[in-house]
Amino acid sequence: TLDPAMVTTDSERIVVSHLYENLMKLSSDGQGGSRVEAGAARKYACTDNSDGTQTYTFTLRDMKWSDGQKVTAADFVYAWQRLADPATASPNAALLEMVAGYRQVRSSGDVSKLKVSAPEENTFVVTLSNRCAYFLSAVCTAAATMPVRSEQPKDWQADPTALCTNGAYRISEWKNGLLTATVPESYYDQRRLQMSTLVFRFETDAAMRTELLKKNEVDFVLGLSQEELADEPETWTPDSYPQVMTLLVNQMAQSLASQELRQAMS
């Protein structure tokens, strides 16, 4: 899917992150890490409130959707309300858990309880129920919280040609499993883009992905197995990749009823 709220795989996130632009974006810090910088929001301000909440006020830059319409704060309000709405059934809804009103939305289905607003066309305001150190770096840069237009064609998520996007690249062609995206003339940060055209190939066959890479028919792939890498160790250069693995133990299962066993597993 190319619906920001519904993405779950790395490949989906990569494509969505090139087609859409969030409030903030990540760039290289020149030392192997990343830093947060302005994206669709040209600036922001953070206020600590007396009740312990925090309010972020984002001022949007002048950006256009791929159909020429202006990107507004209302587009972010709609996208974030839609993400939190239990009716959307997004697997990424918990990204907004720190936003005030999130739990009320989840229990009632009333998206108006989410503390996000657009007091002006270019002003997006978010109130957090408490401080969140990763709000800017992980929530405001995430694929799932990208802006979404409320008026879209039916089944737009499954039809790349119907997508209305605001990012650095816009879809120019969708043919035979290949999605071609080019940089629009109106994009504000063209000078930093190293490629004017990207071609995404959707290939579910792992062996075919490896073959395409070996033949230099693609520049980048996801999902190579350890077995494939071990076959030609001199071909690949390993690099670190940040990842968190979680093991959830069903304590109600008879086979895991022993506390000593669970402690041994940890």
Regions found by a protein language model. Give the residues of each.
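Solvent-exposed, polar/charged alpha-helical surfaces in well-ordered, non-transmembrane soluble domains
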Residues: 17, 21, 42, 74-82, ...
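Sec-exported extracytoplasmic/periplasmic mature domains
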Residues: 24-28, 81-89, 131-133, 140, ...
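Gly/Pro-rich hinge or "lid" segments in bacterial periplasmic/extracellular proteins
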Residues: 122, 128-197, 207
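Surface-exposed binding/hinge segments that line
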Residues: 70, 75-77, 88-149
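N-terminal lobe/hinge region of extracytoplasmic solute-binding protein
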Residues: 1-51, 164
